[in-house]
Curated annotation (Swiss-Prot):
This is Interleukin-5. Homodimer; disulfide-linked. Interacts with IL5RA. Interacts with CSF2RB. One of its GO terms (cellular component) is extracellular space. Homodimeric cytokine expressed predominantly by T-lymphocytes and NK cells that plays an important role in the survival, differentiation, and chemotaxis of eosinophils. Acts also on activated and resting B-cells to induce immunoglobulin production, growth, and differentiation. Mechanistically, exerts its biological effects through a receptor composed of IL5RA subunit and the cytokine receptor common subunit beta/CSF2RB. The keyword Secreted applies. GO terms for molecular function: cytokine activity; growth factor activity; interleukin-5 receptor binding. Glycans are attached at residues 45, 74, 88. The gene is Il5. GO terms for biological process: cytokine-mediated signaling pathway; immune response; interleukin-5-mediated signaling pathway; positive regulation of B cell proliferation; positive regulation of cell population proliferation; positive regulation of DNA-templated transcription; positive regulation of eosinophil differentiation; positive regulation of immunoglobulin production.
Length: 132
């Protein structure tokens, strides 16, 4: 019953966020604030071990980040304002999954591929932490 209630609340919040067209940047900012607010509660179980990617390029470790999040969510007392934190993180995951679907390939001319590759390498050179 509790799981059903949680799923209903999560579904309602997703629908609400979509209906209200809240920008994902706003959801991310609110989630960062909530994370800071609830950090003490989330770190109260010092015996829990979560997977932490050793790679510094977070874009490459999304799966591992959300795997750790699922473990944390399952080990944390639910309810109250911490529930909103997990709902927002779920919204962010759904957004990222939706964006990953846009990675589907489309056959184009070599010039288009090279333009995309150049843009990708530009992002790598400016936004990714490069290891020596």
């Amino acid at each position: 019953m509790r799981m059903l209630l949680c799923l209903n609340v999560l579904t309602l919040s997703c629908v609400w966020a979509i209906a209200m067209e809240i920008p994902m940047s706003t959801v991310v900012k609110e989630t960062l604030i909530q994370l800071s607010t609830h950090r003490a509660l989330l770190t109260s179980n010092e015996t829990m071990r979560l997977p932490v990617p050793t790679h510094k390029n977070h874009q490459l470790c999304i799966g591992e980040i959300f795997q750790g999040l699922d473990i944390l969510k399952n080990q944390t007392v639910r309810g109250g304002t911490v529930e909103i934190l997990f709902q927002n993180l779920s919204l962010i995951k759904k957004y990222i999954d939706g964006q990953k679907e846009k990675c589907g390939e489309e056959r184009r001319k070599t010039r288009h591929f090279l333009d995309y590759l150049q843009e990708f390498l530009g992002v790598m050179s400016t936004e990714w932490a490069m290891e020596v």
